[in-house]
Design a protein with these regions (language model features):
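Short, surface-exposed acidic
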Residues: 10, 56-58, 152-155, 258-270
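Bacterial N-terminal signal peptides that target proteins for export
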Residues: 1-8
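Short, glycine-/small- and polar/acidic-enriched structural segments
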Residues: 23-161, 168-171, 175-181, 192, ...
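Short, solvent-exposed loop/beta-turn-alpha elements that line the ligand-binding surface or hinge
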Residues: 47-55, 201-208, 274-283
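Cleavable N-terminal signal peptides
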Residues: 8-10, 20
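Secondary-structure end/capping motifs
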Residues: 223-297
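Sec/Tat signal peptide C-region and signal peptidase I cleavage site
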Residues: 16-22
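Pocket-lining segment of extracytoplasmic ligand-binding domains
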Residues: 85-86, 115, 158, 164-256
Length: 298
C-alpha cells in the first residue's frame, strides 16, 4: 500500500508532536534539478523553519532516486524529494509517506536535432539511452513504445546516467534517449536535441500533465515531528509561488543551487519542461492512476 498524506492530515495528531531538541539536524534529500525545495533554500525560507523549531535543515544531494531511497531507509535522511517513481516506491516499500507532488512533467524522449526520426513508431531498431529499469523513465518509455505498437524487444536499450543523454545524442552514440529535467533542457538549450514526445503526451495524470517529482518522509519522523513536516511541505508551496510570480529570480536561485548554466534553467522554466502547480497534494485519484500505470508497464 502506498501511504499518502492529504493536505498534511499527517496521520497523527499535532498534539502528539515531540519537540525537537536544540539544533537537531533534519536531513533532506534533493537532486540537482528544478525542485522547489532548492528555491526555498536559496530564498532563505528554510531559515524561518529552523528558527521556529530550533533545527538545522541540511540538503543532501543525490544524482538519482535509488541511493536517495537507500539513505532514507537507513535513517540517513528524514525527508526527500525525487522522481515520482522512486517516491512512490519508497511510500510502498519503506516506512515512508508521500506528502507532496512538487513538479509536473519533466521527462521527454529526445532525438538528435538533425535526426530524421519524427515519431515513436520510427524508433524500431533504434538504440535508446535510458536511466535503467528502476527509473520512472523506463515505464514511460515502455508505454510510449506500446502506444506506437512497439515492444522493448524492438529497440536496443543502452543504460546510462540521465546526465549523459545529451552527450550521447551529440556524438550520435545513440539514436534517442529518455531523461529528465534539467538534462532535457540542457539538450534543447544547447541545440543538441529535440523532443520526440514528452511525458505529458505519454501519460497525462494530473490536469493534463505527468507527475514528475514527489516529496516523501520517514513515518517515524513524521509521527514525532508533524509540525516540521507540515512546514517543510508548506514552504514548497511558498517556493512555487515565487517560481510562478518571479521566474527570473527563481532561475537565478536554481542556477546557484544546482550548478546548471542559467540558459538551461531558463529553458526549463520558460518552455515549461518543468511545470509547477500550487496544489501539491497527492490525491488518491492521482496516485491510483500512477500506480496503475507502473503496474501495466511491468
Amino acid at each position: 500500500m502506498i501511504r499518502t498524506s492529504h493536505a498534511i492530515a499527517l496521520a497523527v495528531a499535532i498534539g502528539s508532536a515531540v519537540p525537537a531538541t536544540a539544533q537537531d539536524v533534519v536531513n533532506f534529500g534533493v537532486q540537482p534539478s528544478t525542485q522547489p525545495i532548492l528555491i526555498a533554500h536559496g530564498a532563505g525560507y528554510l531559515k524561518e523553519i529552523e528558527e521556529k523549531h530550533k533545527i538545522k535543515i541540511v540538503l543532501r544531494s543525490f544524482s538519482y532516486g535509488a541511493p536517495e531511497n537507500q539513505a532514507l531507509a537507513a535513517g540517513e535522511l528524514q525527508i526527500a524529494s525525487a522522481g515520482m517513481g522512486p517516491a512512490v516506491l519508497a511510500a510502498a516499500r519503506l516506512p515512508a509517506t508521500l506528502v507532496a507532488i512538487d513538479i509536473l512533467d519533466q521527462t521527454a524522449i529526445l532525438v538528435p536535432k538533425d535526426s530524421k526520426i519524427s515519431s515513436v513508431s520510427e524508433l524500431k531498431g533504434a538504440k535508446i539511452a535510458y536511466p535503467g529499469e528502476g527509473s520512472q523513465q523506463y515505464p514511460l518509455l515502455i508505454k510510449a513504445l506500446a502506444d506506437a505498437k512497439l515492444d522493448v524487444k524492438d529497440v536496443q536499450l543502452f543504460k546510462t546516467d540521465g546526465s549523459q543523454v545529451a552527450t550521447l545524442l551529440a556524438n550520435k552514440s545513440v539514436d534517442a534517449g529518455i531523461t529528465w529535467d534539467p538534462h532535457v533542457s540542457r539538450a534543447l538549450a544547447d541545440g543538441i536535441g529535440r523532443v520526440l514526445v514528452n511525458s505529458a503526451e505519454i501519460m497525462p495524470i494530473k490536469n493534463g500533465h505527468y507527475v514528475g517529482d514527489g516529496t516523501y518522509v520517514r513515518d517515524d519522523f513524521m509521527k514525532a515531528h508533524p509540525e516540521i513536516v507540515q512546514d517543510l511541505v508548506s514552504v514548497q508551496v511558498k517556493a512555487i509561488d515565487l517560481i510562478l510570480k518571479d521566474p527570473e529570480r527563481a532561475i537565478d536561485i536554481w542556477t546557484k543551487e544546482n550548478g546548471f548554466p542559467r540558459p538551461v534553467i531558463e529553458y526549463a522554466v520558460k518552455q515549461k519542461i518543468s511545470v509547477f502547480d500550487r496544489n501539491i497534494v497527492p490525491s488518491k485519484d492521482t496516485i491510483d492512476a500512477y500506480t496503475a500505470f507502473l503496474k501495466k508497464a511491468g
